[in-house]
Structures are given as structure tokens and as C-alpha cells.
Amino acid sequence: MRHDNDSWDITTSVGSTALFVAASRALEARKPDPLAVDPYAEVFCRAAGGDWAGLFDAGADPKPDHVLFSEFGEQFVNFQGARTRYFDAYFAAASDAGVRQVVLLAAGLDSRAYRLPWPDGTVVYELDQPRVLEFKREVLAERGEQPVAQRREVAVDLRDDWCAALTAAGFDPARPSAWLAEGLLMYLPATAQEALFSGIDALSAPRSWAAVEESVPMPAEVFAYKREEERAAGEEGTFFTLVYNERHAPAERWFGERGWAAEPTSLADYLTRVGRPAPVDDPEFGAMISAIRLVTATKG
């Protein structure tokens, strides 16, 4: 169960979800027709060791009961491939528009500073818990990897004064910026999401961009059942006990009321657009597909 001042590293609580997502991206990259290729996703899983490394060991059978090799896992990998492709394209468009400041909120194991073809002069600010950033930095440094853009770590909890920490790291609010909140909002209570959006708006000059992944809350009784099901299966801390199921202002409306032009895309529509199944009627995965929207906004 979450509490207001909890913290984590890469293998505990919210931090462990970054490994789950990285494993999904790595499995997507192994497909003959991947939607996105993250060459570092498998590297992070191997560095974490244990079951995470075991998913990719040559000649070893994956754990037969690992969720990523279930029907749900297959759909989740499709989702991660599509989500990665969408936000990669978002950054390409922002870069083409002349934006040279990028902010990754709750960066986790995002490797875009290393794998995207950033224009010269681009600075990528990565905000996350100190131990999460440390893990990523050490793993990639050990391999001799160098970021394409200038990468600046901002070790801060997004429930604290992250705006001050970001500007102290060199971020210039007078210049256009591109923001990303990917796989983040569900881990924030509604009040924290409001504060996050307000911070983005306050620090964004005209011609800035913002992209978020958001979801509609589940019915309370369904959410309570899912939490109890997770506990009963001995999987507490996997997902439902980590997220907040609170109603919040939709990103399209919130940014639109403040002078941004926001365009939402449903996950189901985007999956179809990129040639992946969108089983909205599936009893296990359908609710998630139907609930998620990917939103891009630009500030006039």
C-alpha cells in the first residue's frame, strides 16, 4: 500500500514497475515487426538480475507463470510498443518545431536521451527518485554508453518542489520545452496531478509542448476487487496496490482551459492505427485499453 512520503529504488514499489515496462519494451524489440526498438531495455533487466534477467537468458525457458508470457502480457507488450512509438514521434515533432529543452517526469528507465536522434543543443532533464537515476546512470556508464543529447539528472520526488529543482539544474522557463508524463499519472493522487500540471504550465514558454498518458478511473468496486485479487495471489505491490484510482480533470480539458491546444488519441484507436489488436471486449485487458488516452498539447 502506498503512503504519502514513500520512496523506492528500481526493484521496489513504484520503481519496480519501470523494470516491468522495460521488460515489455525489450520483448517488443525482439519481434520481427517491432513498433519501437529500445536497445537498452533488456540491458536494464539483465543488470537488475534475478527473474528480470531470466526473462532473456539465452537457452532458458521463460517462467511459465510470468505475466509477460500470458495472454495479458502479450497485450501489455503491444501496448508498450505502441505507447513508446507514440511518444517517440511526439519528441520528433517537437524537435522539428525547434524545441531544445526536454523534461522527462518520473523518467524511470526511459533511454530516449541515448537512443533518439536529438538535434545539437538539446538538453534532456530526467526527474526521478535518486536511486532510480543512479541505477540507470551506472548501468549505462559501465557499458560506455553516451547520451545523444546533453542529459541532466534531477533527483527529486515529484510530490516535492520539483519546479525549483528543475530550474536549479539549468532549465530555462523563457525557452520552449517539451514535457512528458508517460506511465506516471496513475501513481499520483488527484491533488498531485493538479500540482504537476500547474508546474508544467507555469514553466512553459509559448511554443512549448506537453504529452501525457492518462486513464479513466475504474468503478470503485472493480478497483477494490482487483486490489484484493492481487493480494490474494501474493502479488501485492505489483500494480493495483501502487496506483491511485481517483477522478481528475482530463488533460485535454485542463490544458485547453489554460490556452493550450490539446489533441487526445485513445489507446484503442492508436493500436489499430499501428496494426496491433485492440481487444476492447477482452475481460482481462479490455478495460485498460478502453480507459487509456495519449494526449499531446501545444502552448500558444
Swiss-Prot record:
<dbReference type="InterPro" id="IPR011610">
    <property type="entry name" value="SAM_mthyl_Trfase_ML2640-like"/>
</dbReference>
<dbReference type="Pfam" id="PF04072">
    <property type="entry name" value="LCM"/>
</dbReference>
<dbReference type="InterPro" id="IPR029063">
    <property type="entry name" value="SAM-dependent_MTases_sf"/>
</dbReference>
<dbReference type="InterPro" id="IPR007213">
    <property type="entry name" value="Ppm1/Ppm2/Tcmp"/>
</dbReference>
<comment type="similarity">
    <text>Belongs to the UPF0677 family.</text>
</comment>
<keyword id="KW-0949">S-adenosyl-L-methionine</keyword>
<feature type="binding site">
    <location>
        <begin position="157"/>
        <end position="158"/>
    </location>
    <ligand>
        <name>S-adenosyl-L-methionine</name>
    </ligand>
</feature>
<dbReference type="GO" id="GO:0008168">
    <property type="term" value="F:methyltransferase activity"/>
</dbReference>
<feature type="binding site">
    <location>
        <position position="128"/>
    </location>
    <ligand>
        <name>S-adenosyl-L-methionine</name>
    </ligand>
</feature>
<dbReference type="GO" id="GO:0032259">
    <property type="term" value="P:methylation"/>
</dbReference>
<keyword id="KW-0808">Transferase</keyword>
<keyword id="KW-0489">Methyltransferase</keyword>
<protein>
    <recommendedName>
        <fullName>Putative S-adenosyl-L-methionine-dependent methyltransferase Mkms_0379</fullName>
        <ecNumber>2.1.1.-</ecNumber>
    </recommendedName>
</protein>
<comment type="function">
    <text>Exhibits S-adenosyl-L-methionine-dependent methyltransferase activity.</text>
</comment>
